[in-house]
Every structure is written in structure tokens, then in C-alpha cells.
Amino acid sequence: MAKYAMVIDTRSCLGCGACIAACDLENDTEWRDGRRRTHVPEFFFGEFPNVTRLFVPRLCMHCENPPCVSVCPTGASYKNEDGVVLVHHDICIGCKYCIVACPYMARYLDERKGVIDKCTFCYDNRVTQGRLPACVETCVGHARIFGDLEDPNSEVYKLAKSGVAVQLRPDLLTDPKVFYIRRAVEE
């Protein structure tokens, strides 16, 4: 089995929003109260005129130890054999326990459907067909890299194992499968 992961290079992210649009189109989602499956907040460092702007794309971290799964009372939230954290919409009751449990704030209630929604790495509609997630395929800056974390020939494997790409909040012990290449603020 594969163990899918993503590396996001914050040095290459342009903040253009192509990943957001591709995700919305691919997954028939729409913007609701500022929540989407993926979003790209921007951060500013320094003082004028020496200001650095940084974009940090955020999505579900597809944790190895996902707190959202353990709190789900119906079993709707689960981690599949490829390590992708998903939601069975047909048994989700929209209780929001998983939203509260997620330390990365990656889940939201899709009010149109009354169920929890989040990034799926486009698992069912693309990855199982041998295609890349829509956000990866569309990224203008080539900032998103997707692959098998257990395949030594995979770029994701090489970046994660080299220490170049790091996890957000490793102190939470969730072991997220989305890694980031950091941009030095001084750049």
C-alpha cells in the first residue's frame, strides 16, 4: 500500500489561488463563510519598506494519528489503507466533534449537505485513477508535490526524509502527512 503525502514549498507559492479554484471545481465545493477544503493565508514579516510576504497553503494534514477520527461517534471519519483521512458523507451526522478535535482547523460543516467536509487529496476522483490531486496539477508555481511517502524514489519521500520539508506542529504527535519547505523570512 502507498502512504500518500504532500510537500508544499512556501518559497514557490505565489498566492494566486489556482489551487483553491481547482479544488472547488474538482470537488463541487463552494466558498462558505470563508471555509474551503484548501485555503492560502498570507503572512507579513518585517517593517516597511522591508516587508516579506509569505503564503502558506493550508489543507487537511492527513495525520497518521488523526484526532478527528477517534472522536467521530458514527465512524464517518476514518483513515484508509493509503493513509488518507476521509469522511463517509452518508453516515456523517454533522455533529462537529471532528472540527473541534482537528488542531489544524482543516474541517468545516458544508451547510448545503449538512455534513463535514475537508481535503481528500482528491483520493476517490483522481488519485485512485493514477492522477495527481487537482491542486497539485494546477499549481502555477509548482509549489505542491504529491507522492508516496514510502517510495524511496518519490520526491515526497526524499524531501520529507532529508529534513528539508518539515511538519506543522510536530509537538501535537499527530504525524501529519503534509510537509512544508520553509522560506527564510530574510529573503
Question: Where are the regions a protein language model picked out?
Answer:
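Non-ligating segments of multi-cofactor redox enzymes
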Residues: 1-187
